[in-house]
Amino acid sequence: MTVTVDNASANDSGVSYLRRQMNSVKTSIAGGKYLHMRCAAHILNLIVQDGLKEVDQSIKRVRAAIRFVRNGSSRLAKFKEIAQWEKVDNKAFLNLDVCTRWNSTYDMLKAACTYEKVFARYPDEDPYYTIELLSDIKPGVPGPGVPDEHDWDNARKLAEFLGHFAEVTKRVSASLSVTAHTYFHEIGEVNELVNE
């Protein structure tokens, strides 16, 4: 038997109770040692959050660029106009991420990368773009800056990498089917991704 729950402390108490009950009637295997495994999706989240720290500055620059464009209808209109000039299909929605949810960072980067040429041309059309992204956030704390080629390269690679994690997360988070038997295979796949 396998029990999969989220990481709430009340669940730890419930699983401990279940383990004690099973041990008292001698129905557990290995004393219930493997009865409760942490949620695979939560473990994946911890792995990805740690990895995001490696390219944090690039993510901050892309995020700031999106925030600038979305912060006003005239800016967004100019952005869409540049997308037409650059013949960039502008169906992807520019969204900001929630910093604590890596899957939203994945969605943000995936959409932003489709507009890389537009972001590259935007400073030519709006001088305030560069000024604002370089301006101090608060006294003594510089702005993140304008995303450069290195940042976009990081964003593309990270979006591709996170896409794999998104697929694994979907597979282990299924709520209408049993996933306990796939855990080892999925973690093995993650191990291969990380080692590449």
Indicate where each model-derived feature is located.
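A eukaryotic "domain-edge + linker/cap" signature
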Residues: 1-196
